[in-house]
Amino acid sequence: MSTPKNSTTDLNAFAWTYAQQSGELEQDDRPVATGYSGANEGKNNPELENVRNVGPIPCGRWTITGPPVDTHDHGPFVLRLEPASETQTHARAGFLIHGDSKANPGTASQGCIILPRSIREQVWESGDRELLVVPTIPSKKAEPSE
């Protein structure tokens, strides 16, 4: 019997994985882009995921919902994220994947994941709607050669 694609026990079961500490986004265990989540001392700081408007998006399973929208506050091609029932959101809500501030780059997040539009489009067009947020993505060690 194969492992379900959306298993919560296997990091590799998720098409999309986002690491709070590094801002790395991976698809099927391959690096795709680096963004950020959180503001000021909370930016990419997993220890502050519980602090509203400061910490990064909380760890757990999220569903990427759509269709993408254009908003005045967050710009074009914004993706909404909905937490799975078991994801501890720390009473935080309204998480999105959107673009950075053009006027003040690096300051657009109060917990949302910030990625370039081309990457947001890639995420949506992939058809994969499950995102796993983790504190860090384990480093991949090269296989020993014989």
Per-segment meaning from a language model:
Residues 2-93:
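Gly/Pro-biased beta-strand-loop elements
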